[in-house]
Design a protein with these regions (language model features):
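Non-catalytic extracellular/lumenal accessory regions of secreted precursors
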Residues: 1-47, 183-184
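Acidic, Ser/Thr/Pro-rich low-complexity intrinsically disordered segments
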Residues: 4, 39-184
């Protein structure tokens, strides 16, 4: 039985997901997510949300072996797209044909720095309020992560069938994310 290109791709993605999960070690596996996308004639972002257990350090393992066309970018924030004051916690560009990990400890440091800077710039609060806000910042945790995959613009391809009918060729890609936490 010959496999369809779609079936072949699904088998391949399963292998990539397994590699992604292995890269989490010694962290405890918590879940994985395959995000499929189609290249369009404009840049756009796909956002996925990950919930975290508050006091744990998480490792995020990415596998972009199924990003077969233009490389994508990854940006991780503390809040969803609709918030203007969200903080960029992690960024990676030129993501394609690679496997890599990042951890939330580094992201929390960035979040604390951004919040401390904002507090320092705020001049119209009392000393009591300022010291209260400093304590909040010291103990800040990430409850959720908002991962944005930025898919770049790609020229549309066209194909012509035997009857001379033209149709668009959809260029697709996938990125895999596995998440694990340090369970000590």
């Amino acid at each position: 039985v010959e496999l369809t290109p779609h079936q072949e791709r699904m088998i391949q993605l399963k292998d990539f997901r397994k590699n992604c999960r292995i890269a989490l070690r010694p962290f405890r596996y918590d879940g994985s997510l395959i995000t499929h996308f189609t290249y369009k004639e404009y840049d756009y972002a796909k956002e996925v949300e990950i919930a975290t257990i508050q006091n744990e350090n998480y490792r995020l393992s990415f596998n972009s072996m199924a990003v077969l066309n233009e490389p994508i970018s990854i940006k991780i924030y503390d809040k969803p797209k609709k918030y203007r004051d969200r903080v960029l916690l992690y960024e990676s560009t030129g993501v394609a044909n690679s496997e890599f990990t990042t951890e939330t400890n580094e992201m929390i440091v960035k979040l604390k720095e951004a919040k401390s800077k904002k507090l320092a710039e705020n001049t119209d609060i009392s000393d009591k309020e300022r010291s209260y806000q400093k304590k909040i910042i010291e103990n800040i945790r990430l409850k959720k992560l908002f991962i944005n995959y930025i898919i770049p613009y790609t020229e549309r391809g066209y194909k012509i069938d035997e009857d001379g009918n033209e149709s668009r060729v959809l260029t697709k890609g996938s990125i895999i994310l596995a998440v694990g936490y340090n369970n000590l």
